[in-house]
C-alpha cells in the first residue's frame, strides 16, 4: 500500500512535484527502469508490489474502467507529410491511489508517472512508445481486459492494435496509406471531436492537409 495520503482538496506539495520531475528526468537519461521504480516507491511511500495473477486481474478491472487508448494528431513541419499521429495509453488517479499506477508500471515494465498539469494532486501514467504499446499493453488488454469490456471498447482495442501494425509496416511513410488507413482510424477513435485542442477539426481536414503538404500547399 501507499502511506502517502492527502486530504480532500489538498495540493501535492511542491517538493514532491519537484522530486517527481527529477525522477522522470533521471530515467529519461539513464534508462534505468528498476531504479525508477525504487525512486517512485520512496517518493510516494509505496510498499513493494508482488505481481500475481490476482493483481493482474485487479489491474485489468481498473484499466477497463479508468484507462484510455488514445490517438492524437498534430501538425509538425519536420514530418514527411506535415503531421504526426501519436498513439498513447494513459490512466489517471489521485495521488492517494498511486499504488495502482505503480502496479501498472510493475506489470508493463515501462511507462512514466507524472503530475497532471492544473490538478491539485492527480497523477497520470502514460505509455507512448509504439513498441511497448504493441508488445506489452495490447497483449495485456487481449489477455485480461477485453473479456470484461463492452463491444465498443473491444473495437477500440482492435483499432488501436491495427494502427500499431500499420506503423510497423511503415504505412505512415506512404501518403495513400496515411490518408486512407491511418487517419480514418484516428477519426474513429477520437473522443473529443470538435475540441479546440485537436490538430484538425475532422478527417477531411487532416487528409487534405497531408495531401496538400506534399504539394507544398500549407
Swiss-Prot record:
This is DNA endonuclease I-CeuI. One of its GO terms (biological process) is intron homing. Mg(2+) 2 binds at residue 86. It is an enzyme of class 3 (hydrolase). It comes from the Eukaryota. Residues 71-75, 90-94, 114-116, 191-199 are annotated as: Interaction with DNA. Its cofactor is Mg(2+).
